[in-house]
């Protein structure tokens, strides 16, 4: 690839003036040494030179710069290659998510469009239905068998299936459904946000107070207090 005819080299600085002879000498002494390694060694040696040793090369660089300005008064440095940071920006372009067609907004004036998108609640109407909060917790989306499995999940987790649950405070019932030891803060389902749990500092439950859930069928004139739980469960099953 041929160089452009109008390309003008930059004037050499003091280090380039000094290293011009030193590079040739080091390349002759080490013919197998790579050029990058030679540049590293020359840079280290240049830093070790004193100011008096650098002075002749600094003066020579000033003379070359003045001569360059006389020969090329309109010279302006133009790098051939882009800086590395610009190359990275061009290479790694972050893709934008596709938000759907906006044809329904083209007929609106600019002020009306801004007013529609200014409110977060109004802008939510233009998003797909799956982006609604807590849509994955809608009970209507689950079948009866799925709900039954969800209710059995705390009992399954309570049988030490998760060895790290104790370190997180979920002991004797991963979601606070069975145990509530006094040394740990257990949780309850949040009444306002489905799917979330909130901490509760209630007292510990005794083992005798934990009874299996019993289904009651109350007829008119009957109360729950006088019914034997096991007999009522048998009657409910019948």
Curated annotation (Swiss-Prot):
Alphabetically sorted, this entry's keywords are: Developmental protein, DNA-binding, Nucleus, Repressor, Transcription, Transcription regulation
Q: Which CDD domains match?
A: HMG-box_SoxB
SMART domains tied to this protein:
HMG (SM00398)
Q: One Pfam family, short name please?
A: HMG_box
GO annotations of cellular component type: nucleus
SUPFAM superfamilies, from UniProt? HMG-box
Report the DNA-binding ranges: 8-76
Which GO BP terms, alphabetically?
brain development; hypothalamus development; negative regulation of transcription by RNA polymerase II; neuron differentiation; positive regulation of transcription by RNA polymerase II
Q: Where would you find this protein in the cell?
A: Nucleus
Give a yes or no for keyword Acetylation in this entry. Answer: no
Cited function: Acts as a negative regulator of transcription. May function as a switch in neuronal development.
Name of this protein = Transcription factor Sox-14
